[in-house]
Amino acid sequence: MRVSKYLLSTQKETPANAEVISHQLMLRAGMIRRNASGLYSYLPTGLRVLRKVEAIVREEMNKAGAIEILMPMVQPADLWVETGRWDKFGPELLRFKDRHNRDFVLGPTHEEVITDLIRKEVSSYKQLPLNLYQIQTKFRDEVRPRFGVMRSREFLMKDAYSFHLDVDTMNETYEAMYQAYSNILSRMGLAFRPVLADTGSIGGSMSHEFHVLAQSGEDLIAYSTGSDYAANIEKAESPMPTEARGAATEALRLVDTPNAKTIAELVEQFGLDITKTVKTLIVKGATEEAPLVALIVRGDHELNEIKADKLDLVASPLEFAPEALIRDAIGAGPGSLGPVGLNMPVIIDHSVSVMSDFAAGANLDDKHYFGINWERDLPLAQAADIRNVVEGEPTPDGLGTYAMARGIEVGHIFQLGTNYSKSMNATVLDENGKSQVLLMGCYGVGVSRIVAAAIEQNFDDRGIVWPEAIAPFSVGILPMNMHKSHRVTDIAEQLYKDLSAVGIDVLLDDRKERPGVMFADMELIGIPHTVVIGDRNIDAGVFEYKNRRTGEKQDVPFDQIVDFLKNLQA
């Protein structure tokens, strides 16, 4: 490709409304342009990267035995009513009517459509297992689209769905997809971690997320320093206390604490050990008999809302009680709450169950109890794992301790079981002629999200530093003053033809531009390898090669340059 015949569209200035580096650089590098909130057009450079990501995804899916199909982006509402998600999905589901007043949705996901397809096309166990995938545009009407294509309303996704009659083949396909996703991200040259994950709104049992590691990542990953164990912070298991509860050494006493509304203020003002304090959070209960539930964690720990949401006594989705409701039930407000004398179900974290002589709110405004002890001052409450893990704690496999990293979720695989097939009556006849509900798996990759995540992991102060496999171009040719030198023009043109002939994606900057502008554009769009041609190079019989990632420069003889560049891509 010649720049003179290409829409490069680079920008010098960082757009003011772009919050994260990937959004900034995708705009500056001329990869995307905003059409409306959360809606983007891909310009040539962006589309080249998107297509390379898509190609790797497609190759690995085919290699894993999945079969490509294509389903409509527009879906009939009847299918969503059938599964119950018409009411459950919320405002992210864009709904509309056609000219015949029939309800439709713009698909955020395709479980309903694929299940409907399979129940009509597959009738016998002999046709199973089956794994079908598509690479298709999705739409989710995000309340606040942000971060460019990282969280846009319209996005490109690979979604696969597998169907099984037995758990064994479902597990085999799950493992194959796990490996395929690992292969996809490895081939793209990205540092990543697969992590145990919560199944979220899609539901199901087994679930893993695939995270591209980046300091800007929204998700916190807890991983083992001594094994492959890793989990989303929402899913990471807290260790059970190994120590016994200490004996009571303090008397229970009521203390005035008028200026201590938070744990931090309480600790600072009274010189307390934060591990000897607890936080009490009031949430809505799941039953009329217990409309409120108290959740208690140690002062230095954080409540894990996903874990709490799964408690039988707690209403789902988890909802914190408003202050007015708390005051009406307890007579005090947040900052002064605690377990002593609390007239509602109390669930404590396991770490709280071994505490002694601890401090908590007294359920009276501006007052706390110090020296609280279980089974002396109050009954030992029900205990559960309801907190986030902490760095340095032992991991569940016993092979290391927790460390933390930030990541960007780009893939998610689920074992759905019969969540959709049962509600949609997707069945087949087994070998005995009996009707059996299908088991399902679901496997998603955010194709456009990978593009942004790759940038968040690979950039410097000059622009994007693409991994080789997904760079828009592999090689950039920079002829210095080619419009003033026939020698430079001839050699640049010949090199361009030679590299193109061996299948290397090459961009020849044949503009009448200053060298500084040409170098800046090549570095901004992140081309991995650049070759500089000038009269001095020609006199010496060498090209000047520069590696975008390392900054390394070296002279390469004319007759060796093609093989040199081919070897770099091997």
Curated annotation (Swiss-Prot):
One of its GO terms (biological process) is prolyl-tRNA aminoacylation. Keywords: Aminoacyl-tRNA synthetase, ATP-binding, Cytoplasm, Ligase, Nucleotide-binding, Protein biosynthesis. It catalyses: tRNA(Pro) + L-proline + ATP = L-prolyl-tRNA(Pro) + AMP + diphosphate. It comes from the Bacteria. Its main location: cytoplasm. GO terms for cellular component: cytosol. It is an enzyme of class 6 (ligase). CDD domains: ProRS-INS, ProRS_anticodon_short, ProRS_core_prok. GO terms for molecular function: aminoacyl-tRNA deacylase activity; ATP binding; proline-tRNA ligase activity. It is found in: Cytoplasm. Its EC number is 6.1.1.15. InterPro entries: aa-tRNA-synt_IIb, aa-tRNA-synth_II, aa-tRNA-synth_II/BPL/LPL, Anticodon-bd, Anticodon-bd_dom_sf, Pro-tRNA-ligase_IIa, Pro-tRNA-synth_IIa_bac-type, Pro-tRNA-Synthase_IIa_type1. Consists of three domains: the N-terminal catalytic domain, the editing domain and the C-terminal anticodon-binding domain. Homodimer. Catalyzes the attachment of proline to tRNA(Pro) in a two-step reaction: proline is first activated by ATP to form Pro-AMP and then transferred to the acceptor end of tRNA(Pro). As ProRS can inadvertently accommodate and process non-cognate amino acids such as alanine and cysteine, to avoid such errors it has two additional distinct editing activities against alanine. One activity is designated as 'pretransfer' editing and involves the tRNA(Pro)-independent hydrolysis of activated Ala-AMP. Belongs to the class-II aminoacyl-tRNA synthetase family. ProS type 1 subfamily. NCBIfam families: PRK09194.1, proS_fam_II. This is Proline--tRNA ligase. It comes from Shewanella sp. (strain ANA-3).
